[in-house]
């Protein structure tokens, strides 16, 4: 389990210049709580995975740590070939097929059906579940967390390929290091 007080004290200084909004705290709480819940009996026991997930959210959501909608005006988004399935979430889910597949994988039906109600991907818990499954199972590019963080690999630079080629890979790897330091301290593993 991650000691939230220790974790937040560390990231507040290292990542958020001394203060965080309630939304930034809430978003991280959702992610860390889901991690704690899923870590039992699953491959998600390598804390480097969580550090990389948090680093990715920090980058993809422009430090907000909360699910976002793809940036752009309504007319811009309506011009996208995948509209109305434009980017939503902690990590941008796009295209109808991906909304459908994520919804099926997570068992989302009725008023939570992602195809009928794409804004459901902005719900913080659902966005976190999509991101965890997507990054661990290779939904975005075919690349998975386990390829970059395992007994033989520790590669936060190339892990960017899980989401988006190598754009800002060194920058995100630096975020990963800071989140990892905070998490290890919060677990008594310094």
Identify the role of each PLM range.
Residues 1-2, 190:
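N-terminal secretory targeting signals
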Residues 38-44, 139-148, 187-190:
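Surface-exposed helix-capping loop/turn segments at secondary-structure junctions
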Residues 57-60, 146-168:
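Acidic helix/loop microenvironments that form the catalytic cleft of cell-wall polysaccharide enzymes
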